[in-house]
Swiss-Prot record:
GO MF entries: antigen binding
Function: V region of the variable domain of immunoglobulin heavy chains that participates in the antigen recognition. Immunoglobulins, also known as antibodies, are membrane-bound or secreted glycoproteins produced by B lymphocytes. In the recognition phase of humoral immunity, the membrane-bound immunoglobulins serve as receptors which, upon binding of a specific antigen, trigger the clonal expansion and differentiation of B lymphocytes into immunoglobulins-secreting plasma cells.
One GO cellular component term noted in the UniProt record for this chain: extracellular region
Protein's organism: Homo sapiens
Residue span, Ig-like domain: 20-116
Subunit structure: Immunoglobulins are composed of two identical heavy chains and two identical light chains; disulfide-linked.
UniProtKB keywords: Adaptive immunity, Cell membrane, Disulfide bond, Immunity, Immunoglobulin, Immunoglobulin domain, Membrane, Secreted, Signal
InterPro entries (alphabetical): Ig-like_dom (IPR007110), Ig-like_dom_sf (IPR036179), Ig-like_fold (IPR013783), Ig_V-set (IPR013106), IgHV (IPR050199)
Protein name as annotated: Immunoglobulin heavy variable 3-66
Region (Complementarity-determining-3): 115-116
Residues covered by region (Framework-1): 20-44
Amino acid sequence: MEFGLSWVFLVAILKGVQCEVQLVESGGGLIQPGGSLRLSCAASGFTVSSNYMSWVRQAPGKGLEWVSVIYSCGSTYYADSVKGRFTISRDNSKNTLYLQMNSLRAEDTAVYYCAR
């Protein structure tokens, strides 16, 4: 009975959060060391340029690691591990956030997430 109640409660929570804000990432792939890749994060339900937006990543078996942030004013900051190799940007007309990743290393292997 407890399981059934928990499940109904979870459904109720999820139903209340339906697609007000959505972030859809794309652009991942398998790349050789030294290669480049650009990640995209298309936003809906809010304006990317009016918020600060971040990229974070999670390497296999590890916790979340902050990668980069872009503020509404356009200022950008990077983790030391990616500085000089990664570039965060946004296209206000497409309401999309980007992460250009160059000179990729084995240690950059991770699942990447955009976040508001």
